[in-house]
Amino acid sequence: MDTELLKTFLEVSRTRHFGRAAEALYLTQSAVSFRIRQLENQLGVNLFTRHRNNIRLTTAGEKLLPYAETLMNTWQAARKEVAHTSRHNEFSIGASASLWECMLNAWLGRLYQLQEPQSGLQFEARIAQRQSLVKQLHERQLDLLITTEAPKMDEFSSQLLGHFTLALYCSSPARKKSELNYLRLEWGPDFQQHETGLIAADEVPVLTTSSAELARQQLSALNGCSWLPVNWVNEKGGLHTVADSATLSRPLYAIWLQNSDKYSLICDLLKTDVLDDQ
């Protein structure tokens, strides 16, 4: 199977938009559509349902997703081994799309600014679902995981980096939850427990995504509301808190293998504040 087809599938599943996937992959939208059709033809199933701007994974697509991520990660690892890439100057950091968009992108920029020019340290920023990243960490394919929920595994070490605040936002002022559609943004497996008490029990999300930026851009079009980080929204501007909603504090953890050969480097990197006044 052509790995470029899987790469395209993963990007469309992340953005839920052929146009944005095309931009991220530096392809035309027709090329992205063609690749998805090729993959669907090879598998003999439809991977997405397409209704105007609403693109969703089918059941087959949901089942393929973790395998596609695993295959791509394995392929990347194989390429590195074959190319005899030096590992001592590489450092891989994994997190969800929302964490990268809302806070880790800025942190990565600060890390580069603080690096000595002669260090030659090369960062790799990985975006994937938490379950996939935990597996990569366990298999030594990932050096550091940033997540909102620490996995309960003895071989992992963790450090609480702090907390950030989520609030329920919409695109218009003075709106109530009952007037809005709900856009579910994935903030970790345990977030749904908190979410249950803050959203009506019969509330069915019109959109579920792991991208805060995608959710933010869809709020107006979908007459929706979504849980977004307060500091990030303040920087972006243009949104309003839902009138009858509360705020929610979320922890942020750094996770690594207890016997990681990058332990000293991890300690040095974590001296730079990840949340930076979140």
From Swiss-Prot:
Keywords: DNA-binding, Repressor, Transcription, Transcription regulation
Residues within the DNA-binding region(s): 18-37
GO molecular function, one term: DNA binding
BP GO annotations: negative regulation of DNA-templated transcription
Domain HTH lysR-type: 1-58
InterPro entries, per the entry: LTTR, LysR_subst-bd, Tscrpt_reg_HTH_HdfR, Tscrpt_reg_HTH_LysR, WH-like_DNA-bd_sf, WH_DNA-bd_sf
Superkingdom in the source lineage: Bacteria
Transcription as UniProt keyword: yes
Protein family: Belongs to the LysR transcriptional regulatory family.
NCBIfam families: PRK03601.1
Function recorded in the entry: Negatively regulates the transcription of the flagellar master operon flhDC by binding to the upstream region of the operon.
HAMAP family according to UniProt: HTH_type_HdfR
Protein name as it appears in the record: HTH-type transcriptional regulator HdfR
